[in-house]
Amino acid sequence: MAEEQPQVELFVKAGSDGAKIGNCPFSQRLFMVLWLKGVTFNVTTVDTKRRTETVHKLCPGGQLPFLLYGTEVHTDTNKIEEFLEAVLCPPRYPKLAALNPESNTAGVDIFAKFSAYIKNSNPALNDNLEKGLLKALKILDNYLTSPLPEEVDETSAEDEGISQRKFLDGNELTLADCNLLPKLHIVQVVCKKNRGFTIPEVFRGVHRYLSNAYAREEFASTCPDDEEIELAYEQVAKALK
């Protein structure tokens, strides 16, 4: 008889109305991991302005997101991800770790470059900061268009050309995607709203990647509303003046 699965509940930051999902890439990352694992779970949004006594009892520190697994409370996004990968494992649940270590660091600089770009109010610095973001996006694009080792046929004399894989580490979503995609979504929404900047079409690998990601329910359905992201960055994003 199959072992009964403990109750799994993910507590995430609520949006502006105190109920819907708010802007938090870490919350979305874990939401995606649980969905991809195929485990039965509940998501509870926590209004950071009005935390309930239950939430205070479960997690006195109040750091979001946090996970309730049976009676165990787990905090720290990286540790929660490691825990889920260890306990929700094959044969019952899929392994989500990337096969290629490089997939875990692809696009690693994008969010920092985006933050510097969006927080700047000095027009004289804008071009250089935008170039920094573009350079980070270019590095990701290069990774997405370069064939992975398993895509290369060593017996063929032909050039393997451009990778057509859907995601960072192949044709299935992995933990690497769960980490990067929520951040890329924020970059797109905030840059368009506050700088009129969109990811250049020349970055075909990035556009293919995002298009494939938005076609997946695990990503598209866990994204907060654009308005929630814009609201979260209202005080963070500076106008050029």
Swiss-Prot record:
It is an enzyme of class 1 (oxidoreductase). The modification Phosphotyrosine is found at residue 233. Residues 2-90 are annotated as: Required for insertion into the membrane. It is a single-pass membrane protein. It catalyses: L-dehydroascorbate + 2 glutathione = glutathione disulfide + L-ascorbate; chloride(in) = chloride(out); iodide(out) = iodide(in); thiocyanate(in) = thiocyanate(out). SUPFAM superfamilies: GST C-terminal domain-like, Thioredoxin-like. The chain crosses the membrane at residues 26-46. This is Chloride intracellular channel protein 1. The modification N-acetylalanine is found at residue 2. The gene is CLIC1.
